[in-house]
């Protein structure tokens, strides 16, 4: 498979590649992670032509039952140009796309429903640039450096388990798929990742 796209982020073993202009279908992602196996020789804003097989990668192996991510294994790549504009991020929040608020995947993967199923929603933006609008932390930074947030300071989550203290509680019919994990991926960020408390307001977060 061959694609020509713009590099949006570089990791230690690959990079993220996204179409400058999407196809207009909100059910499908316009980006993919390109696996190189070692530090790639590309930079953010490079336009890349890359070829290789498409694979489903299971973090930790298939025996872990972790959910897979789609990746392109880089067999050949060419830098076509540099300094290109990055694709506009998808807004996650009230002024863009709203995440589902109750269901993760009630149909056991039999129906692809990104409007109502949290699992399908996040697959539809997999590997893409996104902005979590007016994010608020619903848990303190954990020992792995991860921060869990909701958009719009939880305004849309108030009826979906947001407590007075700012934590997000589950219920028998509400598993809060709107909770978004922000992770400091080694080598991507050029600043110190913050340590936050519940209720911290982070503003718009793009990644």
Predicted region positions:
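Extended non-catalytic accessory segments flanking core domains
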Residues: 1-206
């Amino acid at each position: 498979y061959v694609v020509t796209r713009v590099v949006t982020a570089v990791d230690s073993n690959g990079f993220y590649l996204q179409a400058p202009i999407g196809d207009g279908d909100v059910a499908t992602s316009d980006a993919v992670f390109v696996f190189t196996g070692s530090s790639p020789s590309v930079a953010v804003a490079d336009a890349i032509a890359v070829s290789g097989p498409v694979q489903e990668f299971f973090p930790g192996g298939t025996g872990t039952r972790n959910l897979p991510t789609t990746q392109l294994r880089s067999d050949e790549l060419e830098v076509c140009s540099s300094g290109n504009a990055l694709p506009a991020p998808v807004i996650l929040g009230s002024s863009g796309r709203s995440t589902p608020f109750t269901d993760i995947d009630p149909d056991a993967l039999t129906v692809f429903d990104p409007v109502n199923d949290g699992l399908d929603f996040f697959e539809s933006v997999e590997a893409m640039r996104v902005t979590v609008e007016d994010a608020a932390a619903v848990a303190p930074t954990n020992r792995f450096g991860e921060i869990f947030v909701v958009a719009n300071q939880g305004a849309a989550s108030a009826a979906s388990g947001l407590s007075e203290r700012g934590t997000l509680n589950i219920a028998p019919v509400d598993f809060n798929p709107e909770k978004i994990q922000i992770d400091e991926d080694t080598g991507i960020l050029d600043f110190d990742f913050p340590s936050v408390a519940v209720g911290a307001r982070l503003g718009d977060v793009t990644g």
